[in-house]
Structure formats: structure tokens, C-alpha cells
């Protein structure tokens, strides 16, 4: 299962952690994993191409996105990414899980 954790401080999104494999199909044939990956990578690239200091990210056992700037454009791109991930969670609840944590 792909697990997405949205870490907020109040209303501000600070970090997104994405780990796991969807297990929808074999490696290389998994459309759910491909959808999550393309959504996330496209969003990361869009943020960085507009402002390379808007976010930072680390790849390893998954991907960790740190939101540095919550400006209008960055927020819209990240909100769109999250909306797409929620749609994938609705369509594939056995393969994608999203949790939100608030550290106010």
C-alpha cells in the first residue's frame, strides 16, 4: 500500500511523506503506483521550475517533500497534487491511504 502522510502546522502544510508500493499489479505494470508517481513528480518539478526555493525533497525509501514557501502558486500546485492523490485513494482504497497530522 502507498501511504501518504500530510504534516501540517495549523493550516500550513509543512511536509508530505509518501512511502510504499501500491501492490495493484506486478512491479513495472502497476497503474496505481504509476499514477501516484507521475502526480507527485510532476508537482515537484512544477514547484521547482517556478521557484527552486519553494520546496525541497528527498528520495530514498519513498519521497519526502518539505514545503518551504506557502505562497499562492506553490499552494495551488501542492493542493492540486493532494486532490489528485485523494481521488486515487477513493478509486483504489486498498492501494492508497492518506493521513493528515496537525502539529499545532
Predicted regions and their residues:
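Short, conserved glycine- and acidic-residue-centered signature motifs
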Residues: 32-36
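N-terminal intrinsically disordered, cationic/polar leader segments
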Residues: 1-31, 41, 45-104
